[in-house]
Amino acid sequence: MSENALRLIASYVEEAAAARARFFTDHAELVDAAARTMAVALARGGKILFCGNGGSAADAQHLAAEFVNRFELERPPLPALALTTDSSALTAIGNDYGFDRVFAKQVQALAGPSDVVVGISTSGNSPNVLAALRAARDKGCVTVGLAGRNGAIVPLCDYALLVPSDRTAHIQEVHATIGHLLCKLVDHYLFEAVMELGPYLEDH
């Protein structure tokens, strides 16, 4: 391996680790609060809906699968779906109303006030994700956003999980870790530490 290749690897890994460390140093409590709210929603019979574009669409499908199947804990399936998978709905809505509405109309059709809608956008400005979160708010859903440093997504979210990086790849990598921790913490609250969730069920 060349010295240049080694330097590229070392630099990339160092930057990625720094972005991850900065995020979790500053936002661990916010991740926990979002996960706890998701657990409350599921305990009350709600579901989790995910949306995003490109790599974030893959994240949406990945996380929905972790809830429906399982993450690490052997437990019952949890209701979750990615709004990125129904090609007929996506193309019908896109054709008739435009790409900006492909998630929002699904939220209007499928979401209820006991649900949580998670929008994933590395820029924080994806129009169709923003529209989905607006629709979710109109339906009375809790909204969670995964994004980069900022963006129009922030005021639309009850929980805005913002990664302090300008590199899309590093933002996506931290989003994957956040997603796994949301799964792990939801499992913890629903199946390992049920008593910890009790007061929040009473408060909501």
Swiss-Prot record:
Function: Catalyzes the isomerization of sedoheptulose 7-phosphate in D-glycero-D-manno-heptose 7-phosphate.
Pathway participation: Carbohydrate biosynthesis; D-glycero-D-manno-heptose 7-phosphate biosynthesis; D-glycero-alpha-D-manno-heptose 7-phosphate and D-glycero-beta-D-manno-heptose 7-phosphate from sedoheptulose 7-phosphate: step 1/1
Family stated for the protein in its record: Belongs to the SIS family. GmhA subfamily.
Quaternary data: Homotetramer.
Domain (SIS) ranges: 38-199
Cofactor mode of binding and number, as noted: Binds 1 zinc ion per subunit.
Matching InterPro entries: GmhA/DiaA, Phosphoheptose_Isoase, SIS_dom, SIS_dom_sf, SIS_GmhA/DiaA_subfam
Compartments it resides in: Cytoplasm
TM regions (residue ranges): none
Pfam families: SIS_2
Cofactor(s) required for function per UniProt: Zn(2+)
One MF term in the entry's GO annotations: D-sedoheptulose 7-phosphate isomerase activity
Annotated catalysed reactions: 2 D-sedoheptulose 7-phosphate = D-glycero-alpha-D-manno-heptose 7-phosphate + D-glycero-beta-D-manno-heptose 7-phosphate
Binding site for substrate: 53-55, 66, 95-96, 121-123, 126, 172
Residues reported in the UniProt entry to bind Zn(2+): 62, 66, 172, 180
Protein name per Swiss-Prot or TrEMBL: Phosphoheptose isomerase
E.C. code: 5.3.1.28
Gene behind the chain: gmhA
Keyword line: Carbohydrate metabolism, Cytoplasm, Isomerase, Metal-binding, Zinc
UniProt record, GO biological process: carbohydrate metabolic process; D-glycero-D-manno-heptose 7-phosphate biosynthetic process
Note: The reaction produces a racemic mixture of D-glycero-alpha-D-manno-heptose 7-phosphate and D-glycero-beta-D-manno-heptose 7-phosphate.
